[in-house]
Amino acid sequence: MSRYSAIIPNDVVNGDGVCVSFFVQGCPHHCPGCFNEETWDFHGGELYGPDVKWTIIKAISANNITRNFSVLGGEPLAPQNLDMTWEVIDAVRHAYPNITITLWTGYTYSMLMANPNETLLNILNTIDILVDGPFIESEKDLSLKLRGSRNQHIRVRRDNQWEIQDD
């Protein structure tokens, strides 16, 4: 069963504008210098259940303010987390078709596309922004938008095509 680390209902750091951020638990990358090392252990955090997605859906429109949605980790696209990540993203997109959904992954886009399964393709066809690539400490640059190191890319989905928009 998948696990998650945290839900932050009013996050202004991770994403576009005010977001609800969902941190999945478990990461195979173990990037040196990672800001979120406590999310590496696949057995840590909290057990995911269907009530979690409803908590997120309610938080997105709490106090009549619609927020965007961010999915971070841990590694949302790790095989152990893929079904949970899709379940949450699918529910959020159906409830809020016009919000921006951003997902961070330590996998590069080319790694993801080398052998994608249906669940991964569903996720990539539903989110709006993909921040891809592992954090590399020697490439660290805290002035970058949405990224921690220069090797990472911001990809925006437009007309079912991904465009790099690193600036």
Could you say what each language-model-derived stretch is?
Residues A62-N63, A95:
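Alpha-helix C-cap/termination motif
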Residues G15-D51:
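Canonical Radical SAM [4Fe-4S] cluster-binding loop centered on the CxxxCxxC motif
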Residues G49-W54, L82-I89, N115-L121:
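Charged helix-capping and loop-helix junction motifs
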Residues Q80-R93, K140-D167:
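P-loop/Walker A phosphate-binding loop and immediately adjacent motor/lid segment at beta-alpha junctions
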Residues M1-V18:
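Short, charged low-complexity linear segments at domain edges
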Residues N36-D51, I65-P79, N98-M113, L124, ...:
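Core AdoMet radical
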Residues K53-A62:
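A short, well-ordered alpha-helical element
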Residues V88-A95, N122-T126:
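Catalytic-core regions built around general acid/base machinery
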